Regions:
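A short beta-loop-alpha structural element at the N-terminal edge
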Residues: 2-18
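Conserved GNAT-fold acetyl-CoA-binding loop/helix
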Residues: 3, 23-45
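A short helix-loop-beta-strand connector motif used in the catalytic cores of GNAT acetyltransferases and
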Residues: 43-57, 78
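Conserved beta-strand in the GNAT
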Residues: 57, 63-71, 78-83
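Conserved acetyl-CoA-binding loop-helix of GNAT-fold acetyltransferases
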Residues: 84, 90-103, 126, 130
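Conserved GNAT acetyl-CoA-binding A-motif
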Residues: 105-117
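Conserved beta-strand-loop-alpha-helix junction that forms the acyl-donor binding cleft
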Residues: 115-124, 146
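Terminal substrate-recognition subdomain of acyl/acetyltransferases
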Residues: 130, 134, 139-163
Length: 163
């Protein structure tokens, strides 16, 4: 059975390694090699909790196996991050966590959750598509970071973007 609960400070030591691994995974989508930094993961969680972001954790058999962070811009609910331990994937953990985000959105009268997604994150895109999330809502544009190596081009309609 999967248990979903609102995160408290006491869970930081057990969830921080997952946050650190999530950041490594995101960097890998950009071709950047990184290593988990649990102290940064703990700091990130503290920032979320201090800012009042709803953070949910998942447990199976009493052990933490995933987390989800929401940001609320009333009435919109954004999923900032969703991570499940690799050995627990495809077992309903992400779905159970995401249901909590959708319930939070419903509590504000909304029928959708907004998701920031890397364009080459096929795993989360497939997950969201299966849940009916198929509308490209917006594109985030920024200047390249100093030293950033942009290796791909992505076309949306007539526009070509570096990635």
């Amino acid at each position: 059975m999967i248990e979903i609960e609102r995160m408290t400070d006491t869970a930081i030591p057990e969830i921080a390694p997952m946050v650190a691994q999530f950041r490594v995974t995101l960097k890998a989508f950009k071709g950047i090699t990184a290593f988990p930094n649990e102290a940064e993961g703990a700091s990130e969680l503290r920032e979320y909790l201090d800012a009042g972001f709803p953070v949910f954790t998942a447990r199976k058999d009493g052990a933490y196996c995933g987390y989800l962070v929401c940001r609320v811009d009333e009435p919109c609910v954004w999923v900032e991050s969703l991570y499940v331990l690799p050995e627990q994937r495809r077992q309903g953990v992400a779905s159970a966590l995401f249901c909590r985000a959708e319930a939070l959105a419903a509590s504000y009268g909304e029928d959708t959750v907004y998701n920031y997604v890397h364009p080459n994150n096929d795993g989360i895109i497939g997950f969201l598509n299966a849940r009916g999330y198929t509308v490209l809502n917006l594109i985030e544009l920024r200047k390249p970071y100093a030293g950033e190596k942009l290796t791909q081009k992505i076309q949306v309609n007539e526009n070509l973007f570096d990635y």
